[in-house]
Amino acid sequence: MTRNRFLRELIAASAAAYGGCSFADSVRRQKNYDDTTWWDAYVENIMDVDTYLRRKFRQDVTDRATGVDVETLKKLLAETIAAGKASGESWRITKAKLFALQAEKMSIDVSPLDWFPAIAIWDRDDRPIFKITKIDRPREVNAKMLPAWVTKEWYAGNRDGTWNMWQDFDHSVPDWRVIMKLGFPGMKARLGKYAVKGDPFYDGLQIAMDAMLTGTDRFIEQGKKRLGELDARHETIDEGGDIKTKDASLVSRLSSHFRNRLAKEIASLERLREGPPQTAYDVMMFVWLYFFWSEHLDGFQCRSLTELDVFLTPYYDADIAAGRTTEAEFREQLKHFLWQWGSVANYWNQPVGLGGTKKDGTTEFNHVSKIILDVMDECALATPKFLVKVAPNTPDWAWEKMLDMARRHRSLSFTGEVPVAKAFKKWFNATDDDCRKIVMTGCYEPQLHDGANRTGVGHVNFLKPIERMLAEAARSVIAPYQDFDSFKAEYLRRLAHVTARCREITFEIEKVLGEVNPANLMTIATEHALRTRKDGFADGCPRGNDTAILAVGIATAVDALLAVKEIVFERKELSLSGLGAVMSVNWEGHEELRLRMLRSRRKWGNNDPEANALGVELIECFASQLNGRPNSRGGIFLACGHCARQYIVLGEKTGATPDGRKAGEEMSKNLSPTMGVDTEGATALVATLAASDVAKLPGDYPLDMMLHPSVCQGEKGLKAMRSIVEVFHRNGGAVIQFTVFSAEELRDAQKHPEKYENLQVRVCGWNVRWNDLSKTEQDAYILRAENVMKGF
């Protein structure tokens, strides 16, 4: 019998022994845009490592004998809430009980197929806590505690596309440097130092902390059970498939790998039950436990998994020196670690940091960085996404490795440490050490390591004032604006007003964050919150507590304003009223004019002086209403240049605009040009962004750049890509990311999706499989690829 056959049959026997991989089937269809695993068929009986890793967070792989399923948890949570209301207990106590109930009651498993545990709450879109903290509790608290004018104006603006706003609980990162040294027992001891018995604030945290330790105990117990089952499996199978011998030495040798994995997993959990991480594997396990307890059980996205190489290197080097691990084992653990989030397949991707600068000024990139990049490259996952910090000290090998991966569609963003430090010193009085420790979070937002609780609440639609001004002009008998300067001035006045109202509403709705959704884990992880009796997410970080308001459609607004100038005030082809009428019928009867405006080179992204200057004015107008103004959380407001998916959402709520865009179509995303209009090449695009003062958008200053494959070929292509990144950063840009395609390749992928199952494109701050995009989104990428210059 061959070794491979023995391995397959051993795994199959293990799976059969614990009966944990065969469950009721479910029919899957793509539910919506962020359903990224609809294509991945349910597996009735998982027998191999790769399938297990892929399906782990796409179906239930737990041992049902260990606890209850998600539907039962939902009922138990509802009963707990009802009991809490009936008794009049504090919501902080109730929320902690909800966390504890899940940690202590959900079914779990510890499989020999994986280096990390499994939990019943596998579907992030069907978490039992989700509806409670996202819908039920906000509705109850907001109706009771917010002024009527706030909710009325807030919801009205959301409906008509003026903005899109919500209470954000999706952006938190603990200070990993601190809690990694404490471990869970150390966090419990620190909590005890500040806790006041009988105070619901601290009593709730004690409940949650104890539940984390109980949850760890449950994993240990289940691991030992699985290890015992594996040891008891002493029969083997001969070439004919019959059970032939017991206690065979060959079976023992072949099973040693799986037994070793289980034993090391149990040992790691036991170490974490007693103290802080001691090995590189412990670090990964600690991050795993915190993340899934926070996001899947407590309802708070943990938006960074640390600067992985910075944190792992000292542990890995010590492990190798002591003979505790091998590079091969470490690589396998890393693969399994990355696949946890590859399996979850969060549409927005899960951020991981990499690189940076040491205290002595040398680079953080090292031998462990290379291993991590190798494993990431081999996995070829859309998520986790790597938010890489680069600087003049970044070594050539790292540039070449990462840029080669980027041109092959790996999920990488390049953040300039120098421009980010400049913005942080201006707005946060950050020191050099603060800047060195900046953590990359979310899509690609830099934050202080001890203040990474910035919310992204409001998204302002830059096109809506233009739409409304033209609609008003269409109804007006008298021309309301005599020249373009007066039209522009009114636009800027309205943009400033909308931004200010967005800020004022946000100020009110963030007063109740702690009442809506108390953060158990983030509070326990933050000493300042414990000392000051504040919620770790809502307002309890020693620094940070900031609020980002995001700009949507900057480039398209520039294009639309210039189109008004050309059509009405320069060429006088239509009156303002006439142009408004054309917009009201979605360009019907004026296709020739629409195409001319759509194809005009007078657009943001082509280094047109007038477009550049107008962009500067729009950014200044927006930023002046936000930057440095106090929020209600003890921090400040920040203007932000990225817009997540709101360029589509708000585009659907916005009528036709004079730049050639039709009603409902997407607008520009981040600081990038409108899809398909940047025809003058990469140099012109970088120069466009350099024209603006990047410090005006301290939240982030991102550029999505599409390049033709011919630009990126070979060693010359890598040098060209590096030059683009370095010039962008020297000009003050914060983050740049690449999509490298030809229109021909994308058209073929659209026609033959079966040939491109793993093709990824960059959407905004994340990668998405091409086959998960709608045809409309695909067409937009093809249009832009058609116009991308093949040189500089």
PLM features per residue range, with description:
Residues M1-T2:
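N-terminal secretory signal peptides
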Residues R5-S26:
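N-terminal export signals
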Residues M212-D217:
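Short amphipathic alpha-helical heptad-repeat segments
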